[in-house]
C-alpha cells in the first residue's frame, strides 16, 4: 500500500466546521507516513515502490499496489483536481486500485458521480472509500470533535451501497470515555450497515494534538497491550464473518508517538492477538448477532 498526500484539507481544519481538527488528528491529517504533497501522484507512487522494494516484489505484468489517498479528507476540494489525482493513480500499471480516505459528510453527489465514471473507465481496477467513523456514539463524537452526527454516516453508507462503491469503516479502540459496551455497540451498528471492510485502530496519542494535552494532564488513561488485545478479540468475535478485516492495529510515527509505546512493535501485537484468539478458541464472527441489514 502506498500512502499518498495530494494536498487536501478538512472541513474540521479550514474553518468550515472548526479549525482544530479531531482531538487525535496530527498536523499531517493522519497521513504521517505519506510522501510529500509537493510531489505528483506518480512520483509519490514511485517513491513508495522504492521504499517497499525490500519486502515486496511485484509480479511482472500484474498490478498489486494499492494507492491510498490517506492524508486529510480526500473527497474535499476541487472536483476536477481530485478526479485527476485518482485517475493518475488508476492509470499506473502497478496499481491494482485506489482507496480514498474521507469523511461521511464530504461525499457529495457530484463526487460520487465522478467515482461512478472512473469505475466505468477502469473496470479492471478497484475503487474503495474509507469512512472515518471512529465511534457510532454521538456523545463520543462530540468529545473527540468529529464534527458530524452519526446519521450522516448512515446516509453516506446508503449512498455508497446504492452506487455499488465498496467502502471500509474505521473504528478506534480506546477513545476517551468509551466502555467495552460502547465499542461492541459500534461493532453491531457497523454489522448492520455491512460495509466491504473494517479497520480497527488503536488510539494513538501524538505530539501536537489536543489528545496529548489531556494525556499530559493525567485525564486520559491509555490501554495496555493486554487491555487492547482483550477488547480487540471481543470486537473480532462480534464482527460479521462476511466483513473483511483490513487492520487490527497501527503504528504511529516514532517521532510523534507519545503513547502507548508498546504499539511500535506491530509484530508483538499481532503475535499476541493470534495467541489470545487461539487461547479463547475464537474466530471472527463467533459472537456475531445477525440482524436486519441497514441497507435492506
Give residue spans per PLM region.
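Canonical Radical SAM [4Fe-4S] cluster-binding loop centered on the CxxxCxxC motif
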Residues: 1-43
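Auxiliary Fe-S-binding modules of radical SAM enzymes
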Residues: 197, 205-296
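Alpha-helix N-cap and loop-to-helix initiation/capping positions
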Residues: 40, 77, 81, 144-152, ...
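Conserved C-terminal portion of the radical SAM core fold
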Residues: 151-210, 226-249
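Core AdoMet radical
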Residues: 28-48, 52, 56-79, 94-107, ...
Amino acid at each position: 500500500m502506498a500512502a499518498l498526500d495530494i494536498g487536501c484539507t478538512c472541513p474540521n481544519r479550514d474553518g468550515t466546521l472548526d479549525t482544530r481538527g479531531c482531538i487525535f488528528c496530527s498536523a499531517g491529517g493522519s497521513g504521517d507516513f505519506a510522501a510529500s504533497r509537493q510531489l505528483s501522484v506518480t512520483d509519490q507512487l514511485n517513491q513508495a515502490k522504492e521504499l517497499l522494494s525490500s519486502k515486496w516484489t511485484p509480479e511482472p505484468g500484474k498490478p498489486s499496489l494499492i494507492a491510498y489517498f490517506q492524508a486529510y479528507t480526500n473527497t474535499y476540494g476541487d472536483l476536477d483536481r481530485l478526479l485527476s489525482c485518482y485517475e493518475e493513480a488508476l492509470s499506473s500499471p502497478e496499481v491494482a486500485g485506489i482507496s480514498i480516505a474521507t469523511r461521511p459528510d464530504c461525499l457529495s453527489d457530484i463526487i460520487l458521480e465522478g467515482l461512478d465514471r472512473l469505475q466505468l473507465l477502469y473496470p479492471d481496477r478497484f475503487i474503495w472509500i474509507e469512512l472515518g467513523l471512529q465511534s457510532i456514539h454521538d456523545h463520543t463524537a462530540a468529545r473527540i470533535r468529529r464534527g458530524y452526527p452519526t446519521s450522516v454516516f448512515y446516509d453516506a453508507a446508503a449512498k455508497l451501497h446504492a452506487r455499488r462503491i465498496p467502502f471500509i469503516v474505521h473504528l478506534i479502540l480506546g477513545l476517551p470515555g468509551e466502555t467495552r459496551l460502547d465499542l461492541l455497540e459500534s461493532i453491531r451498528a457497523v454489522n448492520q450497515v455491512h460495509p466491504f471492510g473494517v479497520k480497527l485502530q488503536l488510539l494513538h496519542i501524538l505530539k501536537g494534538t489536543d489528545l496529548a494535552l489531556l494525556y499530559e494532564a493525567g485525564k486520559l488513561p491509555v490501554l495496555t497491550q493486554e487491555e487492547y488485545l482483550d477488547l480487540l478479540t471481543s470486537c473480532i468475535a462480534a464482527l460479521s464473518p462476511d466483513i473483511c478485516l483490513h487492520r487490527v492495529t497501527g503504528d504511529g510515527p516514532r517521532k510523534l508517538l507519545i503513547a502507548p509505546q508498546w504499539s511500535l512493535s506491530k509484530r508483538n501485537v499481532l503475535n499476541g492477538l493470534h495467541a489470545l484468539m487461539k487461547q479463547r478458541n475464537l474466530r471472527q464472527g463467533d459472537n456475531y448477532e445477525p440482524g436486519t441489514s441497514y441497507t435492506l
